[in-house]
Amino acid sequence: MSYNGIGLPTPRGSGTNGYVMRNLSHVKKYDKNTNLQSNRNAKALEKRVQDPSISEHECRRQIESKLLLYREQLLEEVSSQHSTDAAASDSNTNFGTENPKPPKAIIKDEQSQSKTKSLDEADVEILVQKYREQLLKELQLQKSTEKGKNFESILQPQKRKETRGFHSKNDDDGRLEERDDLRSSVDDDYYDYPRYSERKSLNSKRHVDNYNENRRRHYDSYSSYDELERRRSSNESYSRRSELPRRDYNRHDERERYSYHRRRERSNSPSYTKNESIPVVDRDSSPEGGEIV
């Protein structure tokens, strides 16, 4: 059975039912460039950042919609005011024909309308323009402010104190050692050129004098012997007879220990007992006394 040219034309002799079946034993070979697919999935999972131009356009569109609603509201007030004025004029004409004096309620309505400013289309446009400027200022403030920094003006002095290290400490008696508000303010002329330079030179001179005095005291106290000799005498690993450190030996072996001390003792040879100098022979001169050179 073949469908659209796919499959066997007849199932006779094929050992199958003639339908195209899926081979479950087939192992699908995937492409080696699997990293590309993973990169695509990672990009799809990334959070999309909003375009600032689109967000600004959306804010301006909301501002224009608010302005349209505000203009419609003002125009409705103007139309209602005109209708009330027309009704009041008609009532005045009717009352003027019948009664010479209108009632008190109509007089109060006329006074309240005279107090309220009559709006025209030009006045409406002026009010709409003012409202637009106000909304644009609010939009600029929203751009300048950041989230989580509303109390920055309050926390800024505290951070400044922490960076400078002006922390209040309590004594045993409970008194404050350091307080920023109780510190004596520095004079205005403290950083003037002559006074500040003189004070700086005086402090540097004091520092040099103290250093020289301590140095002199140190060398006067140890002037009887050398500094290196004093270090060697205090160190146990050095001896006065030899400047080399002592040799480590096996303390469990008696023979090696005694041989080590025996080597250190002076021998009875004449070269060690007497301070005889080695005779220097001049090879250029003739031999004297039958010396064999």
Swiss-Prot record:
Q: Where is this region: Disordered?
A: 30-52, 80-119, 146-293
Protein's UniProt keywords contain Cytoplasm: yes
Bias (Polar residues) occurs at 80-97
Pfam families attached to this UniProt entry: cwf21 (PF08312)
Locate the compositionally biased regions of type Basic and acidic residues.
43-52, 106-119, 159-186, 195-214, 227-259
Question: What processes in GO biological process is this protein linked to?
Answer: mRNA cis splicing, via spliceosome
InterPro entries on file: CWC21 (IPR051372), mRNA_splic_Cwf21_dom (IPR013170)
Q: Which CDD domains match?
A: cwf21_CWC21-like
Location(s), subcellular: Cytoplasm; Nucleus
Residues bearing PTM Phosphoserine: 118, 285-286
The record's GO CC annotations read: cytoplasm; nucleus; Prp19 complex; U2-type spliceosomal complex
* Residues in CWF21 domain copies: 55-98
Q: Do the record's keywords include Secreted?
A: no
Report the domain of life of the source organism: Eukaryota
Q: Which UniProt keywords apply?
A: Cytoplasm, mRNA processing, mRNA splicing, Nucleus, Phosphoprotein, Spliceosome
User: Which family does the similarity line name?
Assistant: Belongs to the CWC21 family.
Q: What does this protein do?
A: Involved in pre-mRNA splicing. May function at or prior to the first catalytic step of splicing at the catalytic center of the spliceosome. May do so by stabilizing the catalytic center or the position of the RNA substrate.
Q: How does it assemble?
A: Belongs to the 40S cdc5-associated complex (or cwf complex), a spliceosome sub-complex reminiscent of a late-stage spliceosome composed of the U2, U5 and U6 snRNAs and at least brr2, cdc5, cwf2/prp3, cwf3/syf1, cwf4/syf3, cwf5/ecm2, spp42/cwf6, cwf7/spf27, cwf8, cwf9, cwf10, cwf11, cwf12, prp45/cwf13, cwf14, cwf15, cwf16, cwf17, cwf18, cwf19, cwf20, cwf21, cwf22, cwf23, cwf24, cwf25, cwf26, cyp7/cwf27, cwf28, cwf29/ist3, lea1, msl1, prp5/cwf1, prp10, prp12/sap130, prp17, prp22, sap61, sap62, sap114, sap145, slu7, smb1, smd1, smd3, smf1, smg1 and syf2.
- Protein name, per record: Pre-mRNA-splicing factor cwf21
Q: What phylogenetic lineage does the species belong to?
A: Eukaryota, Fungi, Dikarya, Ascomycota, Taphrinomycotina
